[in-house]
């Protein structure tokens, strides 16, 4: 009996011991060896565009590192082109290519090389074309995904090329019109000439 009582008492004390260990403070101290400059963190809100924000954030940090000053690159421009390209691939492969909000760093590099890039000021601020203060793709994603899938999985022998104009209009309503030319810091650019001026490769 005494043996059982001692074991029970010991078991009751175990949570107290583990609790005391949990309260131990971590004494690890980190020393900053080199702190790289970064641009402010932006809010993607209700959109699956973390890839666009992180990719352009990295490129903005690279510009700072290269001594090119602070730039605020436009996620809307990148996302617009990426989604249009992805829709084209999904339709050409009859839906065998994923058409979703996600993306990767490669999409940013591809956009930079093929379409250029623009500063944030060259397009409306995220969400403003539809009365929000930030991106909200809940409705956009549902509509565009259904539209692209309907065309991609269609049994039509020939796809009417008007689909691109329709999809382009949907994106224009959410992102604003893609600029052909814009003025930035007193100089006129196209998206391609602006990208070239940044010196990213």
Across the structure, where does each feature detected by a protein language model lie?
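Catalytic-core signature of thiol
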Residues: 22-201
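Bacterial Sec-dependent N-terminal signal peptides
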Residues: 1-23
């Amino acid at each position: 009996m005494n043996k059982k009582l001692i074991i029970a008492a010991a078991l009751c004390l175990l949570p107290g011991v583990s609790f005391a260990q949990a309260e131990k403070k971590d004494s690890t101290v980190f020393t900053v060896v080199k702190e790289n400059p970064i641009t402010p963190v932006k809010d993607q809100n209700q959109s699956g565009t973390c890839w666009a924000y992180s990719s352009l954030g990295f490129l903005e940090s690279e510009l700072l590192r290269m001594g090119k000053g602070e730039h605020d690159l436009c996620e809307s421009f990148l996302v617009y082109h990426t989604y249009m390209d992805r829709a084209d691939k999904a339709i050409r492969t009859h839906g065998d290519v994923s058409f979703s909000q996600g993306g990767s760093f490669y999409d940013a590099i591809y956009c930079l090389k093929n379409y250029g890039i623009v500063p944030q000021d060259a397009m409306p601020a995220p969400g403003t074309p539809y009365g929000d203060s930030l991106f909200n793709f809940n409705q956009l994603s549902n509509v565009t995904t259904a539209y692209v899938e309907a065309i991609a999985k269609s049994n039509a022998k020939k796809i009417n090329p008007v689909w691109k104009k329709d999809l382009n209009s949907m994106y224009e309503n959410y992102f604003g019109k893609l600029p052909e030319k814009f003025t930035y810091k007193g100089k006129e650019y196209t998206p391609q000439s602006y990208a070239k001026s940044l010196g990213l490769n």
